[in-house]
Swiss-Prot record:
PTM entry text: Activated by phosphorylation.
BP term (GO), one: UDP-N-acetylglucosamine biosynthetic process
Top-level taxon of origin: Bacteria
Keywords linked to the UniProt accession: Isomerase, Magnesium, Metal-binding, Phosphoprotein
UniProt-recorded name of the protein: Phosphoglucosamine mutase
Amino acid sequence: MGKYFGTDGVRGEANVELTPELAFKLGRFGGYVLSQHEPDRPRVFVARDTRISGELLESALVAGLLSVGIEVYKLGVLATPGVSYLVRTEQASAGVMISASHNPALDNGIKFFGGDGFKLADEQEAEIEALLDAKEDDLPRPSAQGLGMVVDYPEGLRKYEKFLVSTGSDLEGMKIAIDAANGAASYSARQVFLDLNADITVIGEEPDGLNINDGVGSTHPEQLQNLVKGSDFVIGLAFDGDSDRLIAVDENGEIVDGDKIMYIIGKYLSEKGRLSKNTIVTTVMSNLGFHKALDRENINKKITAVGDRYVVEEMRRSGYNLGGEQSGHVIIMDYNTTGDGQLTAIQLTKVMKETGKTLSELANEVTIYPQKLVNIYVKNDMKNKAMEVPMIAQIIEKMEAEMAGNGRILVRPSGTEPLLRVMAEAPSTEEVNYYVDTIAKVVKTEIGI
């Protein structure tokens, strides 16, 4: 991560931290860096989610791109994975998504994609950051025919929808509830699932600029659960603001998270001989029950740090085609290069349709262990050295010995705050509380503030 670019682009409170001035500079400097790697005039696709600040930041960003001669294709409101897909398939130079994903409406973000549909290379982000920190803007200022032009490209949305539909099965006879989070999926999910012949009901489909992720979507699935519970819906599908993640709800109203979704799709692909190296890539936060289910099915797993960025990096490096996070980011590399909530939903319903099983039957093959996570404020200079403290290392070793393989402890520092995160999983809530509380007490005594 750099000074401006985090693991998911540049983010902040819109018009306060992520200002139009910064958006203009990101467009201008980002466009210039791209132009240095392109023999011809670069063509950049730009999209946004439904936040009220989206058009403000889009206007500034596009102005910056145009000022260095970039040809801009404006996609309007579109899911983040839609940008990734279109950049790659339409041979654009790059893509930019204006979104803060599952964050509330006051936040926004700007994320760049390279021409291959993946996040912009770290080296290029570093070049942009160097220009942002320069005392003077000495970049060329073309005029007349040297300026960039804007092309409105609303047909990009329909191309993305057709792609999604092409990956699925006919869902005739399936009654599906959808929560579009008042976000980007509000513009596509209904059409996609109608094209798949599903019988659908959609909530969270009335964005007003301020209600994105507000009591709806993958981080607030309660409304969807209540809709599905006691009805004849066979599944509920909850997306987040930019539709790059999915949380599902089974026919009984129970949550089916990213771990269970990866297991269901992974097992299906494995049985078809289509799971690359018979391996799923996941993070250290995936539940122990998920790991045990994979072991039972003889499916391998590769573990990364928290963040879909690290999952994608490992998938690219080692040639895996399925990975993701408990939070609902699922990357199916056979189809797209980033987490795609609607694509994941289509693959999940395809498994249901082809196996004839209910979602609860498929999901209950994974027994999720009770999990507890606590955040402990610690001395900032010690958060990365906690395991070097003898008393902390000893208590963790003691707790792991007591678990005897039937539980898991994870202690990791926050990347942005003076926090140590202590997580445990075990067969019962009582055991989880015991393990976490015991470790937390020692951490607070030794390095707490």
